[in-house]
């Protein structure tokens, strides 16, 4: 089974309460080969009316990640620009049985922590992220 397509990726929060987000760059593509889904995402915001609460995530993945707690997916490539100083994402994690990815950062102790919504800038040409990742689906 082979499939190619596009999907709509969006910034959101773990609480699901981000305000209106306007994007000046927003592309997302996938290739599905068997049960593996290869994705590329590019998001850059022009404005965010309200950051909301919780931590930052990207929603709208084209297929649900396999429902297996041992089958988490991480990014194979991640590039970021125009985030709040010292608060840019350094990795992603797609939780099992979901269609979203949570964003993470390295803190001053080099521990990986969830990226707080305070890291989101609300101005133009901000929160630029480019991701390539692979994950498994049961579909």
Regions found by a protein language model. Give the residues of each.
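Surface-exposed molecular-recognition determinants
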Residues: 1-139
